[in-house]
UniProtKB/Swiss-Prot annotation:
GO cellular component, one term: cytosolic large ribosomal subunit
Organism from which the protein derives: Pyrococcus horikoshii (strain ATCC 700860 / DSM 12428 / JCM 9974 / NBRC 100139 / OT-3)
Gene: rpl22
Name of this protein: Large ribosomal subunit protein uL22
Description of how the protein assembles with itself and partners: Part of the 50S ribosomal subunit.
Keyword entries, A-Z: Ribonucleoprotein, Ribosomal protein, RNA-binding, rRNA-binding
Signal peptide (from-to): none
Length: 155
């Protein structure tokens, strides 16, 4: 039996780092990439607070790559953005899992920094709707893999 999955992060140090992964999440890969870009480099507690604000529709996520026909959001100098609630909830679960993994290893949860977070496309769940005259319309659902690596910052 082979490896189930790998992480794209190299040089993982189990003494100082913890990681978590969410596989086959039924969220948009494009919005997941945008949220991950915002969270990369944040302290873990700040990232969880940020996601809570996104879920409460108080703070938008700027769209830098997938922003065609997106309206600007309120705020000084804020360009195209959205409130991806479903994506934020899914990524928050993975971040909490990474935090719990770090606590299990004995790392201080207040000193954890997100050094790697990535979203990758998962398999497509294919389906179809029957239509009139014997036809069918495809309904495909995208899935996404999220991986997170946190490191304890020593000051």
């Amino acid at each position: 039996m082979g490896k189930r999955f790998g992480y794209s992060f190299q040089n993982f140090d189990p003494e100082r780092m913890a990681r978590a992964s969410g596989r086959d999440l039924r969220i948009s890969p494009k919005l997941a990439v945008e949220v991950c870009r915002e969270l990369r480099g944040m302290m873990l507690n700040d990232a969880l607070r940020y996601l809570d604000e996104v879920i409460a529709l108080k703070r938008p996520v700027p769209l830098r790559r997938y922003n065609d026909s997106q309206g600007h959001k309120p705020g000084k100098g804020f360009g195209p953005g959205r409130y991806p609630v479903k994506v934020a909830k899914a990524i928050k679960k993975v971040l909490l899992n990474a935090k719990n993994n770090a606590e299990q290893k004995g790392l201080d949860p207040d000193k954890l920094k997100i050094i790697h977070i990535a979203a990758h496309r998962g398999p497509v769940l294919r389906g179809w709707y029957p239509r009139a005259f014997g036809r069918a319309t495809p309904f495909n659902e995208q899935t996404t893999h999220i991986e997170v690596v946190v490191e304890e910052i020593r000051r």
